[in-house]
């Protein structure tokens, strides 16, 4: 079994999501001995932002690419193959301005490719990357899960569920720590709740 451990927070050792992903991976290895873990830090190894040039590199036949296009396409392909090879993916996804970090969005733009991880058919899109388990370590400075009005502001967990589902992944588990910027007591409570969830979700 292969597990891909992804962090995307820019806060380094101050990051709650990094703390949670580390705990999740440790628990997974304890309950699934022999799991091979590969680590990807998107804050350090950031995929290129999707652009016209980036898309052209992917779409141009390999034997017609420039040197720059060949390098760009190879980098994108490496991220995609790493994703496809994983049976389990643990993703650290803090909420930034109601959504996800740009580094994580760039990674998603690498792996969400028509004909590779999903396809369009006459009856609608079909995911091609199923049979994976994704565990999302969600951290939030505020609280956004306690009412419909607050949940409407969530373009973090909801987006991840949507895009992963579009690629055929419906086994998405969320470990959430929210309100972590609302004082030391609230932060401690949020982390304790998340730790308890890890024990039941892994």
UniProtKB/Swiss-Prot annotation:
> Does the UniProt entry include the keyword ATP-binding?
no
| Keywords per UniProt | Flavoprotein, FMN, NAD, Oxidoreductase
Classification via Pfam families: Flavodoxin_2 (PF02525)
Query: How and how many cofactors are bound, per the record note?
Result: Binds 1 FMN per subunit.
- Keyword Flavoprotein attributed: yes
The reaction(s) catalysed by this protein are: 2 a quinone + NADH + H(+) = 2 a 1,4-benzosemiquinone + NAD(+); N,N-dimethyl-1,4-phenylenediamine + anthranilate + 2 NAD(+) = 2-(4-dimethylaminophenyl)diazenylbenzoate + 2 NADH + 2 H(+)
Q: Which cofactor does it need?
A: FMN
Name the positions where FMN binds: 9, 15-17, 95-98, 139-142
Among Gene3D superfamilies, the record links this protein to: 3.40.50.360
Assigned EC number:
1.6.5.-, 1.7.1.17
A GO term, aspect molecular function? electron transfer activity
> Which InterPro entries did the record assign?
Flavodoxin_fold, Flavoprotein-like_sf, FMN-dep_NADH:Q_OxRdtase_AzoR1, NADH:quinone_OxRdtase_FMN_depd
Q: Which domain of life is it from?
A: Bacteria
**Subunit note:** Homodimer.
Role noted for this protein: Quinone reductase that provides resistance to thiol-specific stress caused by electrophilic quinones. Also exhibits azoreductase activity. Catalyzes the reductive cleavage of the azo bond in aromatic azo compounds to the corresponding amines.
Give the similarity note.
Answer: Belongs to the azoreductase type 1 family.
Question: What is the name of the protein in this document?
Answer: FMN-dependent NADH:quinone oxidoreductase
């Amino acid at each position: 079994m292969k597990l891909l451990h992804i962090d995307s927070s820019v806060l380094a050792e101050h990051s709650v999501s990094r703390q949670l992903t580390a705990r999740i991976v440790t628990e997974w290895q304890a309950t699934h001995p022999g799991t091979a873990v590969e680590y990807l830090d998107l804050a350090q190894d950031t995929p290129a932002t999707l652009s016209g040039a980036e898309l052209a590199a992917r779409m141009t036949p390999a034997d017609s690419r420039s040197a720059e296009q060949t390098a760009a396409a190879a980098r994108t392909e490496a991220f995609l193959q790493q994703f496809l090879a994983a049976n389990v993916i643990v993703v650290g996804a803090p909420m930034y301005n109601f959504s996800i970090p740009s580094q994580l969005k760039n990674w998603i733009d690498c792996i969400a490719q028509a004909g590779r991880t999903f396809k369009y058919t006459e009856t609608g899109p079909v995911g091609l990357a199923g049979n994976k388990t994704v565990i999302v370590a969600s951290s939030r400075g505020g609280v956004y899960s306690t009412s419909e009005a607050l949940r409407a502001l969530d373009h973090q967990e909801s987006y991840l569920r949507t895009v992963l589902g579009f690629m055929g992944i419906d086994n998405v588990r969320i470990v959430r720590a929210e309100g972590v910027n609302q004082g030391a007591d609230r932060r401690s409570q949020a982390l304790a709740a998340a730790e308890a969830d890890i024990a039941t979700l892994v």
